[in-house]
Curated annotation (Swiss-Prot):
Role this protein plays: Catalyzes the attachment of glutamate to tRNA(Glu) in a two-step reaction: glutamate is first activated by ATP to form Glu-AMP and then transferred to the acceptor end of tRNA(Glu).
Gene Ontology BP, a term: glutamyl-tRNA aminoacylation
Gene Ontology terms, MF aspect: ATP binding; glutamate-tRNA ligase activity; tRNA binding; zinc ion binding
Motif ('KMSKS' region): 248-252
Assembly and binders: Monomer.
Pfam family, one: tRNA-synt_1c
Enzyme class: ligase
Similarity section: Belongs to the class-I aminoacyl-tRNA synthetase family. Glutamate--tRNA ligase type 1 subfamily.
InterPro entries: aa-tRNA-synth_I_cd-bd, aa-tRNA-synth_I_codon-bd_sub2, aa-tRNA-synth_I_CS, aa_tRNA-synth_I_cd-bd_sf, Glu-tRNA-ligase_bac/mito, Glu/Gln-tRNA-synth, Glu/Gln-tRNA-synth_Ib_cat-dom, GluQ/Sye
Annotated keywords: Aminoacyl-tRNA synthetase, ATP-binding, Cytoplasm, Ligase, Nucleotide-binding, Protein biosynthesis
Name of the protein in its database record: Glutamate--tRNA ligase
Lineage: Bacteria, Pseudomonadati, Pseudomonadota, Gammaproteobacteria, Pasteurellales
Length: 479
């Protein structure tokens, strides 16, 4: 039987991996980690990474889910050399191989009704036997080929399937445990396990990294590959990801969709760094650049044990990258959140200017965007608790004096604003807090902000002066 390549298989490429999600939902963090491990392993060996969309489940697969998967992969910057390929566009190829297998005696048509199969299963269970097909149709060829039927793979009945899993070590399954797998349904559509095999063969996949839930599929797929005379990839089955409570990660633990993490304000660098450490590590190192991941990652070093997702750790990493990545880079992602929160940044400081100022306090870009609103927009009122403490009648004098000094400035710089604050405190013989706290509340509407000299510089001269005047009038009106 002949291979049908989808792209030139470069003989110099020693490692070719694939990520093959089913478009029945969003790209979740477990799938993203699998994609990352596959991508890193290929890059480590200067190999190739293939993206394949396994959309044979026609009832559950949707274009929206496909788009969400592609969007998630692009956001994570996991670029593929080949693809995306869609299984639904390759049905002719799968059926061609199935027909050849029937001709060569590697597969056979099965005409058994649902009733017969149900009766067979009940009989085997009553005899405490493992339910399996009895190969009734292998010995009976008296049915016309156009009668309703499925096609079954003729699985070996003797021996075992043995493979060395890159994560779990040697795995052996007796062929007596395996049934004659249906590879084509009554409606003529090929089944998942068969499509996967043909795809891996045609795409020259050398290493299959996937979740541990696929372990039971592997011996079936290996037997089909052997029947086709195709090379057997190296398999690596990674463990599941649990929540903080040890239960399987789910929606009740918070975000599980990759794009939900985007929406919640995480940088792709932070999520990638966090995911790579969920089951793999290099000593005590926590922070990895993408280049370091490629250099150091080894699928054989991935843990067999389930990993626990820790949101606090992810937030710590996110804050690290918000502070350490170039502000110009972070600004590209922050802009999305500013737009999402309806903050018009056209009249205010550049995003690159506010990022280093606000990233010390914010854990996510979503928080940073919300905290930056006063740089670009007017606010309706003041924080009640802060106003009760800092907008008493005696705050009018320092605000008025500061307004006078700031108005006189010809240089609207951090240093000049800082000097004006000091001079106000000195002139009135009061502590800096008596100047700074009312000033902060007047300009930001909040009792918390970065240093006020920097804040006022970024808010701008006109806005700052107008807000101080407005605060004075507010306090006087309350008196």
């Amino acid at each position: 039987m002949n291979i049908e390549t989808l792209f030139p298989l470069d003989p110099n490429v020693k490692v070719r991996t694939r990520f093959a999600p089913s478009p029945t939902g969003y790209l979740h963090v477990g799938g993203a980690r699998t994609a990352l491990y596959s991508w890193l392993y290929a890059k480590h060996f200067n190999g190739e990474f293939v993206l394949r969309i396994e959309d044979t489940d026609l009832e559950r697969s949707t274009p929206e889910a496909t788009a969400a998967i592609l969007e998630g992969m692009e956001w994570l910057n996991l670029a593929w050399e080949h693809g995306p390929y869609y299984q639904t566009k390759r049905f002719d190829r799968y059926n061609q191989v199935i027909d050849q297998m029937i001709e060569q005696g590697l597969a056979y048509r099965c005409y058994c009704s649902k009733e017969r199969l149900e009766n067979l299963r009940h009989e085997q269970e009553a005899n405490k036997e493992k339910p399996r097909y009895d190969r009734h149709c292998l010995a009976h060829h008296d049915q016309p080929t156009d009668a309703p039927h499925v096609v079954r793979f003729k699985n070996p009945q003797e021996g075992s399937v043995v493979f060395d899993d890159a994560v779990r070590g040697r795995i052996e399954i007796s062929n007596s445990e395996l049934d004659d797998l249906i590879i084509r349904r009554t409606d003529g559509s090929p089944t998942y396990n068969f499509c996967v095999v043909v795809d891996d063969w045609d795409m020259g996949i050398t290493h299959v990294v996937r979740g541990e839930d696929h372990i039971n599929n592997t011996p079936r797929q290996i037997n089909i590959l052997k029947a086709l005379g195709a090379p057997i990839p190296t398999y690596a089955h990674v463990s599941m990801i649990n929540g903080d409570d040890g239960q399987k990660l789910s929606k009740r633990h918070g975000a599980v969709s990759v794009m939900q993490y985007r929406d919640d304000g995480y940088l792709p660098e932070a999520l990638i760094n966090y995911l790579v450490r969920l089951g793999w590590g290099h000593g005590d190192q926590e922070i990895f650049s993408r280049e370091e991941m490629i250099e150091l990652f080894d699928i054989h070093s991935v843990s067999k044990s389930a990993s626990a997702f820790n949101t606090d750790k992810l937030q710590w990493l996110n804050q690290h990258y918000m502070r350490s990545l170039p502000a110009e880079h972070v600004a590209k992602y922050l802009a999305w959140h500013m737009n999402d929160q309806a903050i018009d940044t056209s009249n205010g400081p550049a995003l690159e200017e506010i990022i280093p100022v606000l990233s010390e306090r914010a854990k996510t870009l979503k928080e940073l965007a919300a905290a930056s609103r006063y740089f670009y927009q007017e606010f309706d009122g003041y924080d009640e608790k802060a106003a009760a403490k800092n907008f008493k009648a005696e705050a009018v004098a320092p605000l008025a004096k500061l307004l006078e000094k700031l108005t006189a400035l010809t240089d609207w710089s951090v240093e000049a604003i800082h000097d004006a604050m000091n001079a106000t405190a000195a002139d009135l013989e009061i502590g800096m807090g008596k100047v700074g706290m009312p000033f902060r509340l007047a300009v930001t509407g909040s009792g918390q902000s970065p240093s006020m000299d920097i804040t006022a510089k970024l808010v701008g001269r006109e806005r700052t002066l107008a807000r101080i005047q407005k605060a004075i009038e507010f306090i006087q009106a309350q008196a």
